């Protein structure tokens, strides 16, 4: 029984020592994130749709900052996001990638034709924001409040029962386009 407690104490001391070493190493050898990547990532819409060719907003921000990727590939963010990134990086704005720029693009949501849905769940697996609910061999539906209109669920559907449709603006869904409202920062003078 005495050997048992010695073994427990030895393993506990080893765990404590290795934990302290790992804690010290994590602070001593920490790699600082690129602040430009952080700022670009904050500007991007965080829809994680992949329309830019990257698996999410963070990898796209890293590609812009580190690899010189074009700043005009974010379809959900549109021109407003591209202009903010251009201002941050102090580069010339570029037209949107392959599309005519629109100041206020219509919000699109996926709609499933429930009569043709076979419940294969391929659209659920493709949706980056989990806006589609349903079960295997059961009818699926899209939660329009969560849908970003990224179009990633349309191609995997074997019965082609998913389409994107514009959302009609109602008093409940209408929002100010805050990107068109000019904002000026006025420095405050402190008098002592």
From Swiss-Prot:
Compartments where found: Cell inner membrane
Q: Which Gene Ontology terms of cellular component type are present?
A: plasma membrane
Q: Which PROSITE patterns match?
A: 4FE4S, 4FE4S_FER_1, 4FE4S_FER_2
Which BP terms does GO give this entry? electron transport chain
Q: Which InterPro entries match?
A: 4Fe-4S_dom, 4Fe4S_Fe-S-bd, 4Fe4S_Fe_S_CS, 4Fe4S_Ferredoxin_RnfB, Elect_transpt_cplx_RnfB/RsxB, RnfB/RsxB_Proteobac
The principal location of this protein is membrane
Q: Which residues take part in binding [4Fe-4S] cluster 2?
A: 117, 120, 123, 157
4Fe-4S domain location: 32-91
What function is annotated for this protein? Answer: Part of a membrane-bound complex that couples electron transfer with translocation of ions across the membrane. Required to maintain the reduced state of SoxR.
* Protein known as: Ion-translocating oxidoreductase complex subunit B
């Amino acid at each position: 029984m005495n050997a048992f407690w010695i073994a427990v104490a030895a393993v506990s001391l080893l765990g404590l020592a290795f934990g302290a070493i790992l804690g010290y190493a994590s602070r001593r050898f920490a790699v600082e994130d690129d602040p430009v990547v952080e700022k670009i990532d904050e500007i991007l819409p965080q829809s994680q749709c992949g329309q830019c060719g990257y698996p999410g907003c963070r990898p796209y921000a890293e590609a812009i900052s580190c690899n010189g990727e074009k700043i005009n590939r974010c379809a959900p963010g549109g021109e407003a996001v591209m202009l903010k990134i251009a201002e941050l990086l102090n580069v010339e704005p570029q037209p949107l990638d392959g599309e005519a720029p629109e100041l206020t693009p219509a919000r699109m949501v996926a709609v499933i034709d429930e009569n043709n849905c076979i419940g294969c769940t391929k659209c659920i697996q493709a949706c980056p924001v989990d806006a589609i609910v349903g079960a295997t061999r059961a009818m699926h539906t899209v939660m329009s409040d969560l849908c970003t209109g990224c179009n990633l669920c349309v191609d995997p559907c074997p019965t082609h029962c998913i389409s994107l449709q514009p959302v009609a603006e109602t008093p409940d869904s209408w929002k100010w386009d805050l990107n068109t409202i000019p904002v000026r920062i006025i420095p405050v003078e402190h008098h002592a």
